[in-house]
C-alpha cells in the first residue's frame, strides 16, 4: 500500500470514442437505469456526428494542412499560457448582455423540466445544460483569445453548442430515436 496522493483543484477531461453498437449494448440496455440515475451520462457532452466515410477523397486540390497548423499553433500557445500561469486561475465573467442570454436560457430549460414538460424524461441532463452553456462560452472566449468579459455573441455560440449537445444526448440516450431523424425533430431541447 502506497501513501495517498493529494490533488488540489483537480480537473479531468475525458474523451471516449466508441462504436454505436458498443455504446447501445453497454449503456442503453442492461446498465441504462444505473447510468441514468447515477447522473453519469449527464456529466458528458455526448455526440455522434454524421459519418463522412466514403466522401473523404483526397486530391491535390482539396487537401491543405493550413488549418491543422493553425490549430496546432493555438494549442501550443494555450499550453505555454497554462504553464506560465503557475497554477493561477483566471475567472471569466459574462458581460451584462451575455448574462441575460444565460439567464433566459436557464429559465427556458428549467420551465421544461417539471410535470409534463418536454424535458421531464432527461432532467438529469437538462438541469446541467445551462452550466454547460456557460462552460462552452468560456472555452470559446479563451480559445479565441477574447479579452474582457464573455460577449453576447460568444454566449449565443455557447448556447447553440449546449442545445446541439442536449439534442444529441436525448437522441443517443433513447434507443427509439437513435438514427430516426423524423422523431428527433420532435425532441428538440429548445425549439427553433
Predicted stretch roles:
Residues 1-192:
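Phosphate-handling catalytic cores of nucleic-acid transaction enzymes
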